[in-house]
Amino acid sequence: YVYEDFLQNLNKDFAKREGLLFVGGFAHPPNADAVLWFAKDIYPRIRQKMEAAGQIPPEFIVVGSKVTDEIRALQQPDNGIIIKGFVSEEELSELYATCRVVVVPLRYGAGVKGKVVEAIYNGAPIITTSVGSEGIPDVEKVLLVKDQPDEFAETVVELYKDEKRLEDLAEKTQVYIREHFSIDAAWDVIKE
């Protein structure tokens, strides 16, 4: 992954940003597993914790091609899960710019996850698993990594309400993407 152009206007107004976003094609089984796991084991904990604290829980927005019936069935009236399915590049850019947190709850899969690099490029604060962070250098600079459902949920709840930390993570993504995924960074690797 190498980028030549970078975001010119990072939306750091987290007071106006809302929702949890997942992006991934559902022809790839790890993505379906991730959304099902998040929807069944993590998202209910987030809703419970936030409602208990008198907060309105965020919507969980799912974007990706080839949505299965099992994934589509997750969206029910008033449960906060929105299955958007396939969206255009423009719509996806808008979702990245307006969501508060990107979640990548992968439990299996191999290699660098394009969805993680894409979310970093788009300035999104990201919570993922160890699997989701595989192959990402200096992962601790831009990703929050949690593997257990309760820890993942608690991290979402804590980060979601911390606008300063959200802004800080978003700013770090832009430094990070230039350091690790720019043409200059690629040339540095080749020279080594």
List each model region and its residues:
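Conserved catalytic-core segment of nucleotide-activated headgroup transferases in glycan assembly
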Residues: 1-77, 82-91, 97
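Glycosyltransferase donor-binding loop in the core domain
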Residues: 27-30, 111, 144, 178
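Acidic donor-binding loop of glycosyltransferase active sites
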Residues: 97-111, 124-125
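Flexible glycine-rich beta->alpha loop in the catalytic core of nucleotide-sugar glycosyltransferases
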Residues: 107-109, 125, 131-134, 150
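Short hydrophobic beta-strand element within catalytic cores of glycosyltransferases
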Residues: 115-119, 125-128
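Short acidic/histidine- and often glycine-rich active-site loop of Leloir-type glycosyltransferases
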Residues: 130-144
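Conserved acidic donor-binding segment of nucleotide-sugar-dependent glycosyltransferases
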Residues: 142-150, 158-163
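A charged, aromatic-enriched C-terminal amphipathic alpha-helix characteristic of glycosyltransferases
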Residues: 164-191
